[in-house]
Amino acid sequence: MTHDIAKFSAAAWQAAHLAGKIIRAAWHQPRSIDYKGPIDLVTSTDRAAEHTIIKVLQRELPSHSILAEEQSEITGVASDYRWVIDPLDGTTNFAHAYPQVAVSIALEFSRQIILGLVYDPLRRECFRAVKGQGATLNDERIRISAVDKLDQALLATGFPYDRRDNADFYLRF
């Protein structure tokens, strides 16, 4: 099947860009923080960014389904397309004014990711990848490192919220 990747990518960028404006506007403001779990935060900025993303995607692609972090599943009209949204990836960082946050949006077709967009609104960097077409940073092609040995590579990671329940698993890394 041929996908209208240009249209989908443009909608994702428009949604991420508007959500990024919300995040930047809130950056130096007091934060309203709620807890979904002991270490799982949500802010009014998460909710506002998510609302904006959903609004854009529903307007541009009304038949698509949406899975959003704060609102759960919003189903379109029997679509094989589903957007997966984290409106403020790095909420804990945002809550502590640590400048490592992003808007993350992906598009699935029949449960296969075909498009991903990660926008850092503080640096105004937009990473985009399309299945089978590679990845870009601000529309310039990027490539992976040529290093092929793990002990010579630079690695960075974060640990998920279940890290306490699965400490043995994560310590093996």
Describe the role of every protein-language-model region.
Residues M1-L88:
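N-terminal subdomain of lithium-sensitive/metallo-dependent phosphomonoesterases centered on the IMPase/IPPase/PAP
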Residues T75-A78, A97, F109-R111, Y119:
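Short loop/turn motifs at secondary-structure junctions and domain boundaries
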Residues R82, F94, I105:
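Glycine/small-residue-rich loop that forms an oxyanion/phosphate-binding "nest" at active or ligand-binding sites
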Residues Y98-A102:
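Conserved structural elements of the adenylate-forming
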Residues A106-F173:
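Acidic beta-strand-loop-alpha-helix segment within the catalytic core
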